[in-house]
A protein has these predicted regions:
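Canonical Rossmann dinucleotide-binding motif of NAD(H)/NADP(H)-dependent dehydrogenases/reductases
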Residues: 8-38
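Active-site helix of classical SDR
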Residues: 128, 166, 174
Length: 258
């Protein structure tokens, strides 16, 4: 089988959390373009339904929308059950939901800290382990987690200690699960995007000064685009990545090289 065929996801089933918009929307689109049926999982069900409709019309794949609070164990279990029942199985997933709260550490409240850790790290544990249980009992699968270059470096000038810590945690969780499940044919990897020009970032006037600083610091001199993450996730979900597990892929335009 040639490499292009090995990259295909024909007949496979999966889901993406935080997929109504931004990075998750693009990775869900990528999976569908590669031949998979995909569930768009998000708390904002109205936008998720619109996204599902757009992807289904563009790709001809079965795309469903599911409302889910990824920090709630029962809700995540219900979501995974729905994916399996409506799509007919579960071969891959992308745990992508996340938030960021910028505040100096000495001013950040404990509630703010817990909110970031809960959404960015605890939800990944729930998503991975609940999806993983199904995969472990059904021959294997591929799990992809969204970490961040913020797990490798300390971002400046914005203070975001909770976000940085949560993403470092995602990377170590990824490695831990990869080792535990390696012999059971469940692969677990993470992607660490740099500054990505999602709609929420580029449409916010108050972020323009920050974007200018980020671009000035970046070797490529620009933000990444969500579409530039599509190739890596398809690779990780596919048979082309059969020997790839426990790895973190930094896609940051060389931002973390210095």
């Amino acid at each position: 089988m040639g490499i292009i065929e090995r990259m295909r996801l024909d007949g496979r089933k999966g889901f993406v959390t935080g997929a109504a918009r931004g990075i998750g929307k693009r990775t869900a689109t990528a999976f569908a373009e590669a031949g998979a049926d995909v569930a768009i999982v998000d708390l904002d069900i109205e936008v998720a339904q619109q996204t599902a409709k757009e992807i289904a019309e563009a790709t001809g794949r079965k795309i469903i929308a599911i409302k889910c609070d990824v920090t709630d164990e029962a809700d995540v279990q219900k979501m995974v059950d729905t994916v399996v029942n409506e799509l007919g199985g579960l071969d891959f997933c992308h745990a992508n939901a996340g938030i960021c709260i910028n505040a100096p550490a000495e001013e950040m409240t404990y509630q703010q800290w817990l909110k970031v850790i809960n959404v960015n790290l605890n939800s990944v544990f729930l998503t991975d382990t609940i999806a993983g249980r199904y995969m472990l009992s059904h021959g294997g699968g591929s799990i992809i987690n969204t970490a961040s270059m913020s797990g490798h470096i300390v971002n400046v000038p914005q203070p975001q200690c909770a976000y940085n810590a949560s993403k470092a945690g995602v990377m170590q969780l990824t490695k831990s699960l990869a080792v535990e499940w390696a012999k059971k044919n469940v692969r677990v990897n993470s992607i660490s995007p740099g500054y990505i020009g999602t709609e929420l970032i580029t449409s916010a006037p108050q972020l323009k000064p920050l974007i200018e600083q980020w671009n000035a610091m970046a070797p490529l001199g620009r933000l990444g685009q969500p579409e530039e993450l599509m190739g890596i996730v398809v690779y990780l979900a596919s048979d082309a990545a059969s020997f790839t597990t426990g790895s973190d892929f930094v896609i940051d335009g060389a931002f973390t090289c210095f």
